[in-house]
Amino acid sequence: MTTQTFDYIIIGAGSAGNVLAARLTEDADVSVLLLEAGGPDYRLDFRTQMPAALAYPLQGRRYNWAYLTEPEPHMNNRRMECGRGKGLGGSSLINGMCYIRGNAMDLEGWSKLKGLENWTYADCLPYYKKAETRDIGGNDYHGDHGPVSVATPKDNNNVLFHAMVEAGVQAGYPRTDDLNGYQQEGFGPMDRTVTKNGRRSSTARGYLDMAKERPNLTIITHAMTNKILFNGKQAIGVEYIQGADKRDLKKVMANKEVLLCAGAIASPQILQRSGVGESTFLKSMDIDVVHDLPGVGENLQDHLEMYLQYKCKQPVSLYPALKWYNQPAIGAEWLFLGKGIGASNQFEAGGFIRSSDEFEWPNIQYHFLPVAINYNGSNAVKEHGFQAHVGSMRSPSRGHIKLKSKDPFEHPSILFNYMSTEQDWQEFRAAIRITREIMHQPALDPYRGEEISPGKQLSTDTQLDDFVRNHAETAYHPSCSCKMGEDDMAVVDHQGRVHGLQGLRVVDASIMPLIITGNLNATTIMMAEKIADQIRERAPLPRSDAPFYVASA
């Protein structure tokens, strides 16, 4: 049987891979193969398509890799969840659909690193806009012709959203009408990646739907990448397994480039399995070294968060929606009308604040939710309630990803090393105390009952630290494990090209040099849009001159 050859092979049909597949195949003379280890994004499966059902995919294995960390030493040795998307759409198929770009100062910080001078906010904003269609139209900060549908909260949504934003303002923090606009600090409405018909706007729906009928795009699902193939230092193809038979290895060849888009956990794992990584470690795993690159799998970062939960004195929360006998009507309204509770992720308000003046831009994020429940759908409080998700944004803690074996089906060793610095503890103590202050503002007086969690009896540093150690959870934002840059631990350059190799790029959240202030999906899509132009050797989009807010010191 002849080996198939394509111009480009993309590994991973996720938030970045689907962008590349769609953009590269706009050139009709270019052939692209898209390999995805998971299955299709079944459009009739409410678990991934209904925004309010976002907890369901995290409870199963069909759409979730369901990684676990090693025992985290500063978190009572808990093995913590690290859910990642599996299937067309990747993590955009199972995420919380919060459309948050981070802060302009994140990108300004990246651009100060050697070699990353073209990653300023002015360089990147045009690519955020290119990807977006916002339901209320475009402006200097937002797009109106992009593949990703973005929905804005409406004034008649749950009263608790408005009360929580108002409470934040009463506590002395700014108000903003657009967390992705001029002022990315303060409390306000939070946009979401949802279509006008109330469906999840994953990159499979947004990008693959416009590209999958093109004759120059081939998509193979249930294709687990074993390794990238090299001729010397040149990436020339990919070896993958389709189905469960590990002996059934298939090879495909790339004329131009292999584009690794498997995410912050799997991309370094695939590189290591392919012989790219720290050479001593690779030899210890009996892997032939193709290229010694010590930064592969290092610099791993994430956001940690916790829930502060309160009883609600008025019957205005979403608690009734958790009752089985109310769910058929909610489901029908969503299915047939694309409206109602089912059409929202229910993260319609939130914000970013600075816990102290030492921070130049916000270091704490809030998501407000008008029901008291864990993100993965567990431990729902059996009465009316509401909660704030709160966590620090730029932890100094660093972790790593390491292979456990050469078996592509074995999950790697993951250690985030959460809460390993004194700054982490200071920020989380401050976050709890600030949240309590916000929750006790007059705007919430009509609604706020007693504090369910952590519970008002916990107030000392030691008590709060114990609560964080035992109850903080991932915000599902792993990143930075194949970082961009030019220092000794950088894995790729400013265009995602792997240092020391030819014909190989990494394009996903793993190449962020530093984690951003907020949810990762919008920025991952932006990065893929930007690098797609570089792969196609197109001129970059004109830089934006839109201003952005920076708090005065």
UniProtKB/Swiss-Prot annotation:
Catalytic activity: choline + A = betaine aldehyde + AH2; betaine aldehyde + NAD(+) + H2O = glycine betaine + NADH + 2 H(+)
Native organism: Acinetobacter baylyi (strain ATCC 33305 / BD413 / ADP1)
Residues involved in FAD binding: 7-36
Classification via NCBIfam families: betA (TIGR01810), PRK02106.1 (NF002550)
Designated gene of the protein: betA
E.C. no: 1.1.99.1, 1.2.1.8
Annotated function: Involved in the biosynthesis of the osmoprotectant glycine betaine. Catalyzes the oxidation of choline to betaine aldehyde and betaine aldehyde to glycine betaine at the same rate.
Gene Ontology CC terms: membrane
Keywords, ordered alphabetically: FAD, Flavoprotein, NAD, Oxidoreductase
GO terms classed as biological process: glycine betaine biosynthetic process from choline
Name of this chain's protein: Oxygen-dependent choline dehydrogenase
